[in-house]
């Protein structure tokens, strides 16, 4: 597909290897194999008109909420709910536009509680208030969630009883927060079987009860291809 500043676009619908040429002399497509030339020409008068025709061809794509296109603040992680709220408050004091803040890992506590889907770190002792404070300043929050669980978490125990955990080593390797990993204390973290519908229901149950119901606005789905 290419789109011209002259208000039209061309979608070249061919599944073989295709060469696209665009220079001062010509704009062209050339495919190695094909029973016929198959393409869609879309004239929309302007860029928006062309994109509208593409959407009619491929199907309507829902837009994310407007706030997701604004400025986001993040770092390796915030170590307490007070730090999260203070960062948002500082942006407001400075008059710098901010739409979202991202909380990365370890809000659940130590590695044996990996991805507990619950704020078990004592520095996040009132996550409901944290969410209310962030929202009161007209900001939003996203949080890191994983496809794996530590052996001391409720999701792990329920999934393990039902045989819904994969049996391979994943990150973090050690239960201790040291580097390099101390393998005398393996973390026991395991990835759940997302191909199993019942396992997905269990995953959502804990995610909903522990985080979403607090008013969390977005997920950062970390390690979707397990380390």
Where are these regions (language model features)?
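Catalytic-domain carbohydrate-binding cleft regions of carbohydrate-active enzymes
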Residues: 1-227
